[in-house]
């Protein structure tokens, strides 16, 4: 597959995920105890054996660089690379103006790789996709551009590009983030929306980006400018994500946009559901990341409190002593002392929680210390005085906070 180049857009600021993105770019936000959001996009390429990948970064990218250096460094393998590319500012002293501009400013890297096809994917969604199957569809249709898509409730579709297709899968309509999205014919409750994943013929991509860059009135965005210009020509096709088969998986079509605190929290709760729609345990589709050299988690009773853990994920290096933890995910090196109760919470790691605490429906970022006796998540009005609380009542403790000291 030497003719395929992956371009992962990883420059998202993630303002709706604050305070988790106050000190890191959105793709570097931890997820699922052991991972970062970027890992899922990278694994989709690696598991498809596409190993020429550029990761385009922009805002607050240092933690992303460190993670990729430790977990995704394949430099030295002939003709294979996973390279982060910082904003080059080749077109002047400015950030990327849009998704298309981000690729345009890095056309020199595309030319250097000499691909036949360019796969442009986002990096802040939770899903599994065998990109090779989408590429095969693209080739079979002799498309110039293929867009992956899925069904979305009509009430949520306004946040996405809404697509219309004919019986052959050819795109015949597209509107980016419409106020009144069109439903799927025969399915009035749902719309067909773009996942923001594209496969281009290399020559088509370069031509369209050059033309778009010359337009002063363009927003230089794939959804707003490139796709609306291309689809009327009849060479843009739509790949149905639900037809993508992952070996070893019984569920198909799971895709979560974790761009808000509520969605991020809910995606973690999905991992803990009885019949989890997204599995971290499929040996036929391994999820690579950087695993620090840590001992197994230690879980034991204290002198006056028995440990009680149910429906949880506990990451390596954690030390749980006499605590009661339910329906929660604990990242690397989480230390919880006796008589503390934690439920429906996500702890991102390197966190110390003292004795006799009560924590419910919270997201606790890295390097947080919580003093003994602290109560979080039981009194919304009090929580709002001291912490960030989402509209849905999820308490978020920012990175490095010292609570109760």
From Swiss-Prot:
GO molecular function list: ATP binding; glucose-1-phosphate adenylyltransferase activity
What EC designation does it have?
Answer: 2.7.7.27
InterPro entries, alphabetically? ADP-Glc_PPase (IPR011831), ADP_Glu_pyroP_CS (IPR005836), GlgC_bac (IPR023049), GlmU/GlgC-like_hexapep (IPR056818), NTP_transferase_dom (IPR005835), Nucleotide-diphossugar_trans (IPR029044), Trimer_LpxA-like_sf (IPR011004)
Cystine pairs: none
Residues noted as binding alpha-D-glucose 1-phosphate in the record, renumbered to the chain: 96, 161, 176-177, 194
Could you tell me which pathway this protein works in?
A: Glycan biosynthesis; glycogen biosynthesis
UniProt keywords (A-Z) are: ATP-binding, Carbohydrate metabolism, Glycogen biosynthesis, Glycogen metabolism, Nucleotide-binding, Nucleotidyltransferase, Transferase
Q: Name one GO biological process term.
A: glycogen biosynthetic process
Residues in a coiled coil are none
Q: Which PROSITE patterns match?
A: ADP_GLC_PYROPHOSPH_1 (PS00808), ADP_GLC_PYROPHOSPH_2 (PS00809), ADP_GLC_PYROPHOSPH_3 (PS00810)
Q: Which CDD domains match?
A: ADP_Glucose_PP (cd02508), LbH_G1P_AT_C (cd04651)
Q: Which reaction does it catalyse?
A: alpha-D-glucose 1-phosphate + ATP + H(+) = ADP-alpha-D-glucose + diphosphate
Domain of life of the organism in this record?
Answer: Bacteria
Q: What class of enzyme is it?
A: transferase
Task: Please give the start and end residues of each transmembrane region.
Answer: none
Can you state the subunit structure given in the record?
Homotetramer.
The similarity comment for this entry is: Belongs to the bacterial/plant glucose-1-phosphate adenylyltransferase family.
Q: Check the record and name the PANTHER family matching this protein.
A: GLUCOSE-1-PHOSPHATE ADENYLYLTRANSFERASE, GLUCOSE-1-PHOSPHATE ADENYLYLTRANSFERASE-RELATED
Summary of the function given for this chain in its UniProt record = Involved in the biosynthesis of ADP-glucose, a building block required for the elongation reactions to produce glycogen. Catalyzes the reaction between ATP and alpha-D-glucose 1-phosphate (G1P) to produce pyrophosphate and ADP-Glc.
The identity of this protein, by name, is Glucose-1-phosphate adenylyltransferase
What's the source species for this entry?
Photobacterium profundum (strain SS9)
Q: What is the lineage of its organism?
A: Bacteria, Pseudomonadati, Pseudomonadota, Gammaproteobacteria, Vibrionales
């Amino acid at each position: 597959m030497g003719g395929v180049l992956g371009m992962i857009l990883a420059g998202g600021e993630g303002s709706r995920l604050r305070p988790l993105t106050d000190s890191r770019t959105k793709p570097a936000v931890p997820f699922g105890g052991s991972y970062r959001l970027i890992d899922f996009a990278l694994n989709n390429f690696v598991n498809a054996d596409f190993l020429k990948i550029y990761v385009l970064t922009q805002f607050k990218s240092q933690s992303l660089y460190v993670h990729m250096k430790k977990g995704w460094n394949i430099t030295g393998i002939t003709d294979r690379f996973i390279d982060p590319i910082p904003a080059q500012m080749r077109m002047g002293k400015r950030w990327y103006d849009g998704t298309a501009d981000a690729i345009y400013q890095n056309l020199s890297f595309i030319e250097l790789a000499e691909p036949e096809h360019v796969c442009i994917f986002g990096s802040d969604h939770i899903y599994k996709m065998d990109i090779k199957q989408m590429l095969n569809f693209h080739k079979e249709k002799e498309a110039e551009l293929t867009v992956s898509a899925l069904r979305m409730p009509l009430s949520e579709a306004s946040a996405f590009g809404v697509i219309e297709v004919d019986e052959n899968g050819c795109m015949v309509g597209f509107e980016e983030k419409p106020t009144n999205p069109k439903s799927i014919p025969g399915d009035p409750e749902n719309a067909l929306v773009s996942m923001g994943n594209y496969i281009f013929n290399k020559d088509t991509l370069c031509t369209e980006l050059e033309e778009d860059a010359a337009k002063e009135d363009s927003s230089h965005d794939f959804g707003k400018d490139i796709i609306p210009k291309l689809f009327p020509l009849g060479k843009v096709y739509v790949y149905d994500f639900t037809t993508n088969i992952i070996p070893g998986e019984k569920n198909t079509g799971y895709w979560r946009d974790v761009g808000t605190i509520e969605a991020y929290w809910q995606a973690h709760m999905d991992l803990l559901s009885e019949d989890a729609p997204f599995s971290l345990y499929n040996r036929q589709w391994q999820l690579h990341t950087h695993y620090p050299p840590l001992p197994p988690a230690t879980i034991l009773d204290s002198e006056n409190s028995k440990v009680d853990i149910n429906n949880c994920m506990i990451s390596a290096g954690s030390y749980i002593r006499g605590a009661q933890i339910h329906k929660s995910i604990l990242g690397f090196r989480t230390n919880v002392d006796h008589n503390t109760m934690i439920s429906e919470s996500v702890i991102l790691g390197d966190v110390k929680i003292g004795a006799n605490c009560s924590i419910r429906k919270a997201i606790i970022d890295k390097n947080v210390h919580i003093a003994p006796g602290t109560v979080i998540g039981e009194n919304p009005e009090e929580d709002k005085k001291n912490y960030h609380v989402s509209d849905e009542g999820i308490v978020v403790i920012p990175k490095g906070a010292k609570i109760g000291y």
